[in-house]
Amino acid sequence: MRTVQYREALNEAMSEEMRRDPSVFLMGEEVAEYDGAYKVSKGMLAEFGPKRIIDTPISELGFSAIGVGAAMNGLRPIVEFMTWNFAILAADQIINHAAKMLQMSGGQFHVPIVFRGGNGSAGQLAATHSQSFEAMYANIPGLKVVTPSTPYDAKGLLKSAIRDDDPVLVMESERMYGDKGEIPDGEYLVPIGVAHVARKGTDVTIVSFGKMMKVALAAAEELQKEGVNAEVIDLRTIRPLDTATIIASVRKTNRLVVVDENFPMVSIASEVAYRVQKDAFDFLDAPVLRINQADTPLPFSPPLIEASLPNPARVIAAVKEVMYLVK
C-alpha cells in the first residue's frame, strides 16, 4: 500500500486506463497545458499528447456533445467539468442524449462516456458555484452516478466508470483533491453499485457519501465517547443504489440517520428513507431522520455557510433523537 492524494488517485486511474485502452481520451477546460484546474491531469499531456489530452473552449455544451458523439462511434471519452455547476450548460447532452441514446437507438448505440469534476460546496464560492447535483442526475434513467469519498474509491470507481459501456457521472469535490489515503500498489477496481461499511457499529446506522462522509465519521467518533456505537455506510454509488447493504445494517441497528449535502426536497436522503421504510419498516425503532443542506442557495458568508451545511453537531443531535437520548 502507498499514500496518495485524491487528485493523484484520479490521475492514476485515467493514465492506467489510457495505457490499457487507446480509445480512452480526456477533454475539458485547462486539462492539457495547465494540468487541470485542480492538477488532476498533471503530466498526462506529456505522456499521451494533444490528441488524447485535449484542451477545449469554454463551451460545456459543445465539448460534451463532441464527447457523446465520440462515444457513439467507438471511443471512450472522459469529459472533465471544472465544476458540476458549469455542467448545467451541458445538461441537454447528458440527460437527453448520453442517457437516452441506447434506448432511443433500439440498443444500437452504447454511450461509454465519463463526465467528472468537482461538485458541491467548496468554501466561499457562493450560490452559483456550490451546488450538489447527485440527486438531480440520479433521477435520470440511463445514467450512473458515483461519489468517491477516499483516494482508494476515487481510483477504483473511476477505472470502473471508464470501462463501463454506459454514461457514468463521477462527482468529486474541490475540498477533497488534496486529501490523502492509501491505495494498493497493483491494479484494482471498485465495482459500481456497491456500498461500503466504513465503520461497524450496533446502535444506529448513519448513511452518507462523498465529502459528507467526513461529517458522518466525525460524528460517529464523538458518539462513541458517549457510549453510542454507530455504523457508518458510504454509499459510493448513488445510482444504482445499494439498498441491500443499508437494509442489512438497519435490521441490526434499528435506527437510521442519513447525511446528505443535497437540498432536502427530493434528495438522496429522501430516497434512502423511503426504501428503508418500505423494506425494513418493522425493524425501525424510530423514524428515519435526515441531515441536508438548508433549503436555500448557499451563502458567501462563512458563518452562514456553517449554518447551512451538515455538520457533526447536527448529526449527533439527530442520532440522539432516534435513540431517544434527548431530554
Give short role names for the model-derived ranges.
Residues M1-M171, E174-K327:
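Thiamine diphosphate
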